[in-house]
Amino acid sequence: MSELKERLLPPRPASAMNLRDASVTRPSASGRPPLLGVDVLGLKKRGQGLRSWIRVDTSGNTQVMEVDKFTMMRRCDLPARDLRLLDPLFVYPSTILGREKAIVVNLEQIRCIITADEVLLLNSLDNYVLRYVVELQQRLKTSSVGEMWQQENSQLSRRRSRSFDNAFENSSPDYLPFEFRALEIALEAACTFLDSQASELEIEAYPLLDELTSKISTLNLERVRRLKSRLVALTRRVQKVRDEIEQLMDDDGDMAEMYLTEKKRRMEGSMYGDQSLLGYRSNDGLSVSAPVSPVSSPPDSRRLDKSLSIARSRHDSARSSEGAENIEELEMLLEAYFVVIDSTLNKLTSLKEYIDDTEDFINIQLDNVRNQLIQFELLLTTATFVVAIFGVVAGIFGMNFEIDFFNQPGAFRWVLIITGVCGFVIFSAFVWFFKYRRLMPL
């Protein structure tokens, strides 16, 4: 990976080093070196808006180039708002946009422009971007070898049998176009990245939730709160990728717009057809020396226009049938990764449901503890009421007036016994009433 970083990073120009050395060594009027450690050429490039891009062609070859924003807009025929989606300084939701000459992909760390001939990425040291570049190179080189092998086999079979060649001369190799292969690798990288994050979250979440159910503490609750925040953010990102793929699958026009190789081939074919038509008309033009028959020329022109209209209608019908097949091909590709991202979303949904179940279980435990505290408080209140009865009796007998009851020696004992029995009866009556009303467990 370090070798790839060194290969993809643009080398520092010698002029920049000279300017930097000169700025360091040249003394100023005050005796201090001006612009100490400042890359003057780098500041100039930033002022011009030059950015480093990684270019991957159809053969898997990489190239680092520095292009400004307006040149990139003209090169890919993109508006400025689409290029802002690729800026790593801004946070945008996952988006896949099909334009006239390019596909703008913004899937997590993978932000690139896919054309019919190349893939353009902002030069970055992010490991996921470098892995995407490496995987794209390997896939493109493997597919190019497979196409060469298939072409050699087709040539060999064509030499062996002419009938076999006549039967299968119109068959095309079962390979995806370049833009679909690049898009597939971007989808695979994004889905793999999100699925790995979901798996890491699962590994961390389930033991923590099990520990929380057995021991409720402030530390565990704080850890679960942070875990749930991460889960909500990750679920939102996965949901956005899933919605973007589903939106593409539901719109046939957007899928047809993403078939860049076919559009390029049609454009080249139409230009070639126009040139051949102009050449045909110039070759069939009337010479000056030959006599012109006013009767035979209009039917020839009508016959020519009729043949051209028939050829155009056949071309349009063939184009529509090929477009339907290509849309179906792209739809199958998107459907495969829709299943993958939907599985990741189901995994996160199951984890969220497990967290909700744990929260419900904890709430039930807390409700049970709160009910026990309420029952205990009810018993204390009842006991306080019974003790208050003793206080009332003591207050009555503590008044300063003459009672004959004070002169009897065993009267105080009977007062205590009768008061205690009455208090016990009152307390038992309250407890029975609470159990009868199911305010306390039986």
Curated annotation (Swiss-Prot):
> What PANTHER family does its record include?
MAGNESIUM TRANSPORTER MRS2-1, RNA SPLICING PROTEIN MRS2, MITOCHONDRIAL
> What InterPro entries does this protein's entry cite?
CorA_TM1_TM2, MRS2-like
Annotated region Disordered: where? 1-30
Q: Which GO terms describe its cellular component?
A: membrane; plant-type vacuole
Name of the featured protein: Magnesium transporter MRS2-1
Per the record's keyword annotation, is NAD included, yes or no? no
> Which domain of life does this protein belong to?
Eukaryota
Highest lineage ranks of the organism?
Answer: Eukaryota, Viridiplantae, Streptophyta, Embryophyta, Tracheophyta
Expression by tissue, per the entry, reads: Expressed in the whole plant except stems.
User: Does the keyword section mention Amino-acid biosynthesis?
Assistant: no
Instruction: Identify the residue span(s) of motif Required for magnesium transport activity.
Output: 398-400
Q: What is known about what this protein does?
A: Magnesium transporter that may mediate the influx of magnesium.
Q: How does it sit in the membrane?
A: Multi-pass membrane protein
- Give disulfide pairs as residue numbers: none
Where is this protein localized, as stated in its record? Membrane
SUPFAM superfamilies attached to this UniProt entry: Magnesium transport protein CorA, transmembrane region (SSF144083)
Swiss-Prot/TrEMBL keywords: Ion transport, Magnesium, Membrane, Transmembrane, Transmembrane helix, Transport
One Pfam family of this chain: MRS2-like
What does the further note read?
Has the ability to complement a mutant in yeast lacking magnesium transport capability.
- Species of origin reads Arabidopsis thaliana
Residues passing through the membrane, by range: 378-398, 414-434
Spell out the molecular function terms from Gene Ontology: magnesium ion transmembrane transporter activity
Similarity-based family? Belongs to the CorA metal ion transporter (MIT) (TC 1.A.35.5) family.
